[in-house]
């Protein structure tokens, strides 16, 4: 553009002094033609720049829309992660509850078995002592000792044992 203006200026200076009236008219027509061409060129250039600016603005708007869509998608993904995290926490709480229940059940069974064992052993001891008392009454013991003494009369080995313990 500067070149065209400089060229036009050069022609005006160079031919301004020695032109005839007809050449001058021709020069003015040429200059007018150049101006018209230049004006057309400028208008076309302006239109191209406007079109380019419009395309850039459209691309920018499209990019902004896409970024908004991506942001919305990230928000959805974040919400989904929160939901999954909440579900996992709930599942962990349920599992801890089940585990604690099982531990309590095992502790109750062990406690019951220990209590039952002590009760049964105590009853067994009492029953055993009662049976022993029934079986080892003094009169039965005397009868047993008399029977052993009778047998010791015929059995020398038994006689030695009873003497050793002072029962003969």
Swiss-Prot record:
Protein name as annotated: Uncharacterized protein aq_1900
Organism field: Aquifex aeolicus (strain VF5)
Keywords of this entry: Cell membrane, Membrane, Transmembrane, Transmembrane helix
Keyword Cell membrane assigned: yes
Tagged with keyword Nucleotide-binding: no
Family assignment from sequence similarity: To A.aeolicus aq_1446.
Membrane disposition: Multi-pass membrane protein
Primary subcellular site in the record, as a coarse category: membrane
Cellular compartment(s): Cell membrane
Gene3D superfamilies to which the protein is assigned, alphabetical: 3.90.20.10
GO cellular component, one term: plasma membrane
């Amino acid at each position: 553009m500067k070149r065209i203006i400089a060229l036009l200026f050069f022609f005006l200076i160079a031919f301004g002094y020695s032109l005839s009236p007809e050449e001058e008219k021709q020069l003015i027509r040429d200059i007018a033609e150049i101006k018209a061409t230049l004006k057309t060129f400028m208008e076309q250039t302006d239109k191209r720049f406007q079109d380019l600016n419009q395309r850039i603005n459209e691309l920018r708007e499209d990019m902004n829309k896409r970024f908004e869509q991506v942001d919305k998608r990230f928000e959805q993904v974040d919400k989904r992660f929160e939901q999954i995290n909440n579900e996992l926490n709930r599942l962990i709480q349920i599992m801890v509850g089940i585990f604690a229940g099982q531990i309590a059940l095992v502790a109750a069974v062990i406690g019951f078995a220990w209590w039952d064992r002590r009760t049964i052993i105590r009853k067994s001891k009492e029953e055993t002592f009662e049976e022993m008392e029934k079986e080892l009454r003094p009169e039965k013991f005397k009868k047993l000792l008399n029977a052993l003494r009778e047998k010791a009369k015929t059995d020398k080995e038994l006689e030695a044992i009873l003497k050793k313990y002072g029962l003969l």
